[in-house]
Structure formats: structure tokens, C-alpha cells
Swiss-Prot record:
<keyword id="KW-0560">Oxidoreductase</keyword>
<feature type="active site" description="Charge relay system">
    <location>
        <position position="224"/>
    </location>
</feature>
<dbReference type="InterPro" id="IPR000639">
    <property type="entry name" value="Epox_hydrolase-like"/>
</dbReference>
<dbReference type="InterPro" id="IPR029058">
    <property type="entry name" value="AB_hydrolase_fold"/>
</dbReference>
<comment type="similarity">
    <text>Belongs to the AB hydrolase superfamily. Bacterial non-heme haloperoxidase / perhydrolase family.</text>
</comment>
<keyword id="KW-0575">Peroxidase</keyword>
<dbReference type="InterPro" id="IPR050471">
    <property type="entry name" value="AB_hydrolase"/>
</dbReference>
<feature type="active site" description="Charge relay system">
    <location>
        <position position="95"/>
    </location>
</feature>
<comment type="function">
    <text>May be a chlorinating enzyme involved in 7-chlorotetracycline biosynthesis. Able to brominate as well.</text>
</comment>
<feature type="domain" description="AB hydrolase-1">
    <location>
        <begin position="22"/>
        <end position="255"/>
    </location>
</feature>
<dbReference type="InterPro" id="IPR000073">
    <property type="entry name" value="AB_hydrolase_1"/>
</dbReference>
<feature type="active site" description="Charge relay system">
    <location>
        <position position="253"/>
    </location>
</feature>
<protein>
    <recommendedName>
        <fullName>Non-heme chloroperoxidase CPO-A1</fullName>
        <ecNumber>1.11.1.-</ecNumber>
    </recommendedName>
</protein>
<comment type="subunit">
    <text>Homodimer.</text>
</comment>
<dbReference type="GO" id="GO:0017000">
    <property type="term" value="P:antibiotic biosynthetic process"/>
</dbReference>
<dbReference type="Pfam" id="PF00561">
    <property type="entry name" value="Abhydrolase_1"/>
</dbReference>
<keyword id="KW-0045">Antibiotic biosynthesis</keyword>
Amino acid sequence: MPICTTRDGVEIFYKDWGQGRPVVFIHGWPLNGDAWQDQLKAVVDAGYRGIAHDRRGHGHSTPVWDGYDFDTFADDLNDLLTDLDLRDVTLVAHSMGGGELARYVGRHGTGRLRSAVLLSAIPPVMIKSDKNPDGVPDEVFDALKNGVLTERSQFWKDTAEGFFSANRPGNKVTQGNKDAFWYMAMAQTIEGGVRCVDAFGYTDFTEDLKKFDIPTLVVHGDDDQVVPIDATGRKSAQIIPNAELKVYEGSSHGIAMVPGDKEKFNRDLLEFLNK
């Protein structure tokens, strides 16, 4: 099983398929690298090398108690890129993974990178405030933590509805999508589930985004019920120099998994990679 051991002894599991220029996928909360199966196949079939790791406390990586903050996540990512000696990398990050990508650039720069893709990602900041009126209210994050702590198995089933906008007429989500979400969520540690909410809910990545000096594609659904586009994707595209924004009309937070949306995203991703 492919493992990268971090500077503090955590074992990070990753998939490493294909050959060619590397594309590294960073998953969201509460998922793992399996969320990127369709994208991994798409890039490998197109001649790229696809890599997707499980964040600490997620999937097959070490179920640690500590280290659920973005400085640590960014350093874990740096350990992976360094261990595999990856260069000319495109980082593709979903949701919470977008914070990991942004903080990686903020802490480690873009020397190993070619480009970046932010998909339904949390930067610049999620929490609602006077400066961020379109953000998410504090009580939402409290409810997320409470759900993880009290009855997480049912909570993840309920959460999948909004994640995929299954509560909208004409939605394209399948029962398989929901089942896959639940399976991955249950592989996350309970402590990681709670602490990640504090991390992605309240961390401000504005200064990290200002350090981007590589081509960046921002993709976001305008019906994202988890990470509102007006507070995140649109603002990130304004902050990152020369970023390209693609808005998917009517699409949910689960673009990379839902039939129809995932094929569209794969086409846009490959077009961006081929530039």
C-alpha cells in the first residue's frame, strides 16, 4: 500500500496511477481520495499521472488525534510532494481541500507547481461576518460538530442530501452517490470530523490566495448549499491574480461525483491541463 510518512510520523495513504505530468487531487470533508476516482481515470487516460491522498484521520491514513489544522495539512501535502519528488504539478482541490491548497501556497510557495484548480472550495473564508456577509453563520458549524458527535452515522446520511442538492427538483444525484459519501464519511475519525469543522469554518485564506502566481481555475456550482459561491468561489477568483472562474448553473457541492456534472468538470479540467 503506497504510504508517505510525514515529518511527525503520520502515514498518509495515496493512490498513484499513470505516468506523465503529475496531477494531485486533494479531497474535501469528510471524504477521502476515493472521491476522485472518476477524475483520476480521466487524467490517466489522457496521459497524465494522477495522485490522490487521504488526509490524516481520513480513509486509510493514520487515525491521529491531533494535527487537524491547515498549517499541518499543508505541511503533510508538502511532505507528499517532496517524498515523490513531484514537480510541474497541477493541484486540484475540492471544498476543504481548497484550504489545504491555499495554505500550501502560502507556506511553501509555488516552486513545485504548474497550476491549480479550486473546485467548490472554501477560500477565502467561510464564516459569516461584517466583512463577509454572504458567509455561513456560526450556528451552522456548531450543528455540524454536534451531528458528528451525537449520531454520526445518521448525520452523514442526512448531510449527503444537501451536499448533492438532492432536495432540489430534477437533481441528478444517485443513491450510489449518497452511499459512497456515507462510506467515505464513516472512515473519517470522529475527532477529525469535529476539529476539521473548526479548521475549515474559521480559517481565513485571503493572504494565501494573494500569493498565487500560477494559472488557476476556479469552478463552483451556483446551487452549492454547503459552500456558498458568493462567499467563496466568486471572491477567490477576484483575489487570485488572473484566475479563471467557471460557474456551473444549478450544480451542487458534489460536482466531481454527480452524473452529468462530473463529465463536464472532467472536460473542463482536461482543457485546463492541456493549455
